[in-house]
Structure formats: structure tokens, C-alpha cells
Amino acid sequence: MPDPARAKRLAKRISTIVASAIEYEIKDPRLAGVTITDAKVTNDLHDATLYYTVLGRSLDEEPDYEGAAAGLEKAKGVLRTKVGASLGVRFTPTLAFARDTVPDAAHRMEALLAQARAADEDLARVREGAKHAGDSDPYRVLGEGDLEGPATGGPDVEDEGGANSHDR
């Protein structure tokens, strides 16, 4: 019977074993900036997918994703052997590596948010000295001689008679 809790524990353990082996035991220079971010194990415990990110050598340099993928593919057998020796389970899961795109998407979202903030600041600067176009109440009609008197001729003026008047 599949046990999801056991699969999660096994995935966490596999993640630490593989990350440690990549950092300390595998001497492939293509794996220098590889970090294991997550691991998923199927409920039957036969397959494990490890998600990784690759860091560039400097902030300006683009990471070598193809080289890291080739290095992980080459080291897959050695890593599976180390996982099997450390876990002590009857069947050692097969390892598959997938590039984790979450950090890239997060950087893209941060850039979009920064761009939106800059646009908001530009709009706020433009808005500072602006005033409304026209009068405060464009539908208000002032009476003769009244500067601030009641409106005349508008819909709020009492009707002296006509279709809307009631009998008194």
C-alpha cells in the first residue's frame, strides 16, 4: 500500500544524499554551481525526480544549464549507487533530474514588480501638480446675480405646473 508520508521522507533523504555527493564527492567541474532544490518520489518508491538550479560563476555570467544537465546525466549511476548504499531500502529508486524553473520565474516576477513600481512613481510625479479639468460641478448653473445661489433651470427646480405636478 502506498504511503505518501514515507515517500516524502525518502525524497528528503535522497535530496540530502545527492546534494552532499554533488558537493563533496563528484569531481565534475560542470556540477560546481548545481544546487538540489527539491525531490519527489513516486508512492511506489521506484522513481525519484530531483529538481536542481544552476548558479553562474559570477552575477553577470549566465549559468551553463546544458553542461549541468550533461554532468548530472553522466553522474546518475554513481549517485544512484550512493543513494542505495545510504538508504538501505530493498529497491533503490531510479533518479531523474529536472531543472527547477521556480527561481527564474521569481526573478522575472521581481523585475516586473520593480517595473510597475517605477511606472507608479512616474505617474505620481506627473500627478503632483495636476488639477482637475473644468469646474468642480460642471452641471451647476448659476442664477443672475448669484455667485453661489441655488441653481436655476436644472432638474431640481420646483415645477410650477405641468405633467409632473399634482393636484392641490
UniProtKB/Swiss-Prot annotation:
Disulfide pairings: none
Ranges for region Disordered: 125-168
One Gene Ontology cellular component: cytosol
InterPro entries per record: KH_dom-like_a/b, RbfA, RbfA_dom_sf, Ribosome-bd_factorA_CS
Alphabetic keyword roster: Cytoplasm, Ribosome biogenesis
Annotated Pfam families: RBFA
GO MF annotations in UniProt: ribosomal small subunit binding
Locations listed in the record: Cytoplasm
GO biological process annotation, one example: maturation of SSU-rRNA
Ranges of biased composition (kind: Basic and acidic residues): 125-138
Record function comment: One of several proteins that assist in the late maturation steps of the functional core of the 30S ribosomal subunit. Associates with free 30S ribosomal subunits (but not with 30S subunits that are part of 70S ribosomes or polysomes). Required for efficient processing of 16S rRNA. May interact with the 5'-terminal helix region of 16S rRNA.
Assembly with partners or alone: Monomer. Binds 30S ribosomal subunits, but not 50S ribosomal subunits or 70S ribosomes.
UniProt xrefs under PANTHER family: RIBOSOME-BINDING FACTOR A, CHLOROPLASTIC-RELATED (PTHR33515:SF1)
Family: Belongs to the RbfA family.
HAMAP family referenced in this protein's UniProt entry, alphabetically: RbfA
Protein known as: Ribosome-binding factor A
GN (gene name): rbfA
